[in-house]
């Protein structure tokens, strides 16, 4: 009954909140309610700007005093003062000072602020003014309030016994009262002393000093906090602090308290220099009191460094380095620098030199993986890559390329060998084409030399010290495009694009590269090779394995084709690709039957995209294993996009257990097929309400994998968001048949309107959350 009740309640809320006015832009609506400066802004020295005065009556007292009565208007540059009576006085002879005095009510306007109050003193030879008992509104942006005294200066405003809010008139959702307030105009921030924060007129907290942004400029200070409750974290509260160290250097520190785990400190530092930009991130928990994942209390931490630079015209430096304390880190802590479903994090750096015909790269690479294995992947340190390209040589008939690499492999395990690998790969391509099609004839040579060294462990396997491998390759690639304007669908043009490829590469036993006996605790072949994901596009790849340690023999024909449909505006609306490899001879790297291609043909592979209309898109992929006589892979996604970020996405993913197991190494098995059905939705229900929901169900386990519901209310001056999430997790010594969940509830509250650009609805941020974040997977738009 509870499930039905919540469903009906949710539908009721959706129906009640939905409005066609959601198409309007909230930011534009909010800015309609603020004053805007009329006319062109006048620049210049106030001493040199003329003063224009209009009034019903005027009384002159020599040349130092004048009194104007009745609908008095005083204009000077951008300033405009209106009142029932205004007096103009001039003081002094040399460097005389002129003042305008308004009493018993006035209105003042310039390009930055509008005020009305009781008394005003306007300095006509500068931008200064002194005002009593005023109501004010900022011009062109949200911000208003009251003050007993206001001092207007060229670069700042000082207000005594003042209030401030970004809410529009007739709304007092929140406000700040301060004994003294100083608004810095160019720096776009306000300082407040003895400040009281109120919600609907009710005092919430007091602080002796407060800084608040009133623009887009970066300022040091407290940012919006976040809070919530979780099964694993307990009650938690995160308070970010922003430090604007320099124009090109800033930092954000976020202490986070979790009642079940303790204090976590998160720090992010960004920098921008002449030779590059990047950031450092540290997440650190000294002692994790909640030890389900580790079975012991210990520190948990993350370090990230990302850097990109372009210097000395042709040089590039790139760093992408992430390291966590343990393999369960991303399962326990949500971070934008990794996800438990990725299975690994990168740790690599490279420096590269680019020229039109060649490039050189020196890099260091390794991965931190989260699989339950005792032996991790190899690190490549150093790795030197050189590429050379020269097209249209031999009178424009041939394209030449050369890839070469030198790399040293090392492993943390004493059981694993180390090695140097030297590789050179020249290729010649003969491109032939005419209006009927194109034929590319490519010849290539793989020449590799290994210098290997046995592992230092007592039980390390003996290994061949020197291995040489030379493999020639020839590939013929033919394709054509056949167009038919008389498609069976009226108004559409159909193309048929058949593709034929022949690939030949002789067999060479490569079992001496790396360990001869495959270690079940090591995921990979050789030093950096593993099976690549198979799909339609992989049918036309040269190699089945990543890296260079396993290059399979090939004597095969690949047949494939794509059909496309174009509308009358030449926009592609639908495509379908299908193909298969036919093996003329066994494809293998050694004599192990497990490392051979199964059967005389590969799986049938299909890929398709369909842009149904401007709002609906569909994508699907399918593989049928002719050896197992069953579906091995299937994916499909249907998405509805109405406007803005509004979307509904339905997805289904299937991976056959036999397909998984035949791609795993040694005695590792997955144990079941993957059958997963998912739904993601994000919707601006009205101008103010936003909803994001996500649900993934494992059909094999008959249990949900992840559930998420987030709803946010946005107004012109504040927003509040609530997110509820339930997802599958794990712990140390967990039984294979045991499914554990973490339940969490989060709350965010923000003050809006302080910056002209802070009216976003946070849909993108909510879609990124979770183990299975939203991915837009369409190629037709």
Swiss-Prot record:
Q: Taxonomically, what lineage is the organism?
A: Bacteria, Pseudomonadati, Pseudomonadota, Gammaproteobacteria, Pasteurellales
Q: What are the annotated GO cellular component locations?
A: cell outer membrane; transporter complex
Biological function: Together with LptE, is involved in the assembly of lipopolysaccharide (LPS) at the surface of the outer membrane.
Gene3D superfamilies associated with the record:
Lipopolysaccharide (LPS) transport protein A like domain (2.60.450.10)
Name the protein family.
Belongs to the LptD family.
What main location does UniProt list? membrane
Q: What is this protein called?
A: LPS-assembly protein LptD
* Example of a GO biological process term: Gram-negative-bacterium-type cell outer membrane assembly
Annotated localization: Cell outer membrane
What is said about its interaction partners and assembly? Component of the lipopolysaccharide transport and assembly complex. Interacts with LptE and LptA.
Using the record, list the residue span of the signal peptide; answer none if the entry has no such feature. Answer: 1-24
Q: Does the keyword Acetylation apply?
A: no
Sorted keywords for this record are:
Cell outer membrane, Membrane, Signal
| Alphabetical list of InterPro entries matching this protein | LipoPS_assembly_LptD, LptD, LptD_C, OstA-like_N
């Amino acid at each position: 009954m509870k499930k039905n009740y919540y469903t009906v309640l949710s539908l009721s809320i959706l129906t009640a909140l939905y409005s066609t006015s959601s198409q309007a832009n909230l930011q534009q609506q909010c800015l309609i309610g603020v004053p805007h400066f009329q006319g062109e802004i006048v620049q210049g020295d106030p001493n040199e700007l003329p003063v224009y005065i209009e009034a019903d009556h005027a009384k002159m007292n020599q040349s130092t005093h004048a009194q104007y009565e009745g609908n008095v208007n005083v204009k000077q540059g951008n300033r405009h003062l209106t009142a029932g009576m205004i007096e103009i006085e001039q003081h002094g002879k040399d460097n005389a000072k002129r003042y305008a005095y308004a009493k018993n009510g006035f209105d003042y306007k310039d390009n930055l602020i509008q005020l009305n109050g009781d008394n005003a003193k306007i300095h006509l030879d500068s931008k200064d003014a002194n005002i009593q008992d005023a109501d004010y509104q900022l011009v062109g942006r949200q911000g208003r309030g009251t003050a007993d005294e206001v001092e207007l200066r060229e670069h700042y405003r000082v207000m005594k016994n003042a209030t401030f809010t970004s809410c529009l008139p007739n709304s007092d959702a929140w406000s700040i009262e301060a004994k003294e307030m100083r608004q810095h105009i160019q720096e776009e921030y306000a300082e407040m002393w003895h400040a009281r924060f109120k919600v609907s007129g009710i005092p919430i907290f007091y602080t002796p000093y407060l800084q608040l942004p009133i623009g887009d400029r970066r300022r040091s200070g407290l940012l919006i906090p976040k809070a919530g409750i979780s099964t694993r974290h307990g009650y938690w509260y995160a308070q970010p602090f922003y430090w604007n160290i320099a124009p090109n250097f800033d930092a954000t520190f976020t202490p986070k308290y979790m009642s079940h785990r303790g204090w976590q400190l998160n720090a992010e530092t960004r920098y921008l220099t002449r030779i590059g930009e990047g950031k450092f991130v540290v997440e650190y928990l000294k002692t994790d009191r909640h030890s389900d994942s580790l079975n012991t209390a210990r520190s948990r931490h993350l370090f990230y460094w990302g850097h990109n630079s372009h210097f000395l015209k042709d040089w590039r430096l790139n760093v992408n380095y992430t390291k966590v304390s343990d393999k369960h880190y991303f399962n326990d802590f949500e971070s934008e620098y990794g996800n438990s479903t990725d299975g690994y994090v990168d740790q690599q750096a490279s420096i590269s030199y680019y020229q039109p015909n060649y490039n050189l790269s020196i890099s260091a690479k390794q991965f931190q993986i989260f699989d339950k294995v005792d032996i991790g992947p190899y690190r490549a340190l150093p790795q030197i890559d050189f590429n050379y390209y020269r097209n249209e040589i031999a009178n424009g008939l041939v394209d030449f390329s050369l890839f070469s690499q030198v790399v040293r492999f090392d492993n943390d395990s004493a059981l694993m060998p180390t090695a140097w690998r030297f590789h050179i790969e020249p290729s010649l391509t003969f491109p032939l084409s005419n209006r009927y099609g194109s034929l590319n004839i490519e010849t290539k040579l793989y020449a590799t030399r290994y210098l290997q060294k046995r592992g230092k462990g007592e039980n390390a396997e003996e290994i061949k010290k020197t291995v040489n491998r030379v493999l020639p390759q020839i590939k013929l690639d033919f394709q054509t495009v056949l167009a038919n304007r008389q498609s069976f669908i009226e108004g559409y043009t159909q193309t048929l694009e058949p593709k034929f490829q022949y690939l030949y590469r002789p067999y060479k036993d490569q079992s001496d590269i790396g360990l001869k006996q495959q270690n079940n605790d090591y995921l990979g072949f050789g030093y950096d090779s593993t099976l690549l994901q198979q799909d339609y596009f992989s049918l036309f790849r040269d190699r089945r394995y990543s890296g260079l340690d396993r290059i399979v023999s090939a004597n095969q024909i690949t047949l494939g084709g794509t059909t496309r449909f174009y509308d009358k505006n030449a926009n592609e609306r639908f495509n379908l690709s299908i193909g298969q490899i036919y093996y003329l001879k066994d494809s293998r790297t050694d004599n192990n039957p497990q490392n051979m291609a199964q059967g005389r043909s590969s799986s049938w592979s299909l890929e398709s995209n369909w842009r149904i209309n401007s709002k609906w898109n569909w994508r699907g992929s399918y593989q049928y294993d002719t050896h197992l006589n069953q579906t091995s892979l299937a994916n499909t996604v249907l998405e509805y996009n109405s406007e803005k970020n509004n979307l509904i996405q339905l997805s289904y993913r299937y991976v056959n257990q036999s397909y998984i197991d035949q791609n795993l190494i040694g005695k590792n098995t997955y144990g079941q097929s993957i059958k997963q059905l998912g739904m993601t939705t994000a919707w601006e229900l009205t101008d103010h309400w936003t909803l994001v929901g996500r649900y993934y169900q494992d059909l094999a386990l008959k249990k949900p994998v992840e559930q998420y519901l987030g709803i946010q209310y946005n107004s012109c001056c504040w927003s509040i968001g609530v997110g509820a999430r339930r997802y599958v997790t794990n712990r140390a010594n967990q039984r294979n048949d045991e499914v554990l969940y973490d339940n969490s509830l989060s709350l965010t509250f923000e003050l809006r309107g302080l910056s002209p650009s802070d009216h976003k609805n946070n849909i993108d941020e909510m879609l990124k959350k979770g183990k299975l974040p939203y991915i837009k997977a369409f190629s037709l738009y």
